[in-house]
Amino acid sequence: MAEGIWATWYDLAQGVTSEARQQFLDWTHEVYCPYLRAQPGYTWVAHYRHTGGGPQMEKVKTTAVGRTQDAIGSGNDYLLLVGGLSAHNFFKPSIKDAVLPEGFDARLSQRTGLRTAVFTVEASVNGPAPREHGPGTGPGPAIQMGSFRMRTPEEEFDLGRWYAQYRLPFMAQLTGCIATRKLAGVAGWAKHSVLYEFTSLEARLKHFEEPHEALALDRTRWESQVIAGTVHAPGSPFIGERIWPPLE
C-alpha cells in the first residue's frame, strides 16, 4: 500500500506580534500536532518553517519555473506534513469534514493564505544519510518540496522519464540526502510534488543546490528542459527546517 501525505502551506497574519506567533506555534506543537498523530491511520506529523535557499535557487524560482495564476492560497511561511498509511486515510473521515475539538477552529483560523493537498507516494529512494530514528519516522531536519503541474501531456511523460531515469537514482547517491519521494496529487491544486529530505540546510545547499539545482539555469541540460515545462504553486519549492518534532 502506497503511503499518503497531507500537506498544508500557510502564513500567519501580517502584523501579528512575535508573542502571538509564538503562542500559535506552541499550541500547534503541544496540542494540534499530537492530536493529529493520534488519529487512526496517521503515521507521523512534521512541521517546517520556511527558510529559503541560496542565490541559485532564488534565480531558478524567478527565471526558470512557471507560476500559476490560479486563485489558490499563497501561504509559504510554514508547511505542516502528515503521513498516512494511504492517501485514503485522509478521507475517512475527510480532512474537510472532520469535527475538531472545541477551540481548534479558532486557533486554526489564524492561518492565512491556506493551501492544502493530499498526495500518494508514486516512487521513493533512500539516500546515503541515515534517518534519525530508523524507518517509519517523519521527514528529516531539512526539506525541499516542490508542488506543480505540467504545461502539456507530452511534458508529463518527459517528467516521468526524468524522475525514473535520472533524478531519483541521482538522489539515492547524494551526500546529505536522507530520502526522496516523488508524489502524485490525489486532491488539491498540485498534480505533482517531490519531497527531498536532507540532514541539514547546509548539506542541501552544498551538495544539492549549488552543484545540481543550478543546472536548471543551463538551457542545454535535461533538467532545464523538464523544469521549463512546470507550473508551480506560489513560493514553490518550499525550503525549510523542521520545528516539530524538535531537532535533537
Feature roles, as predicted:
Residues M1-E248:
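Macromolecular interaction modules
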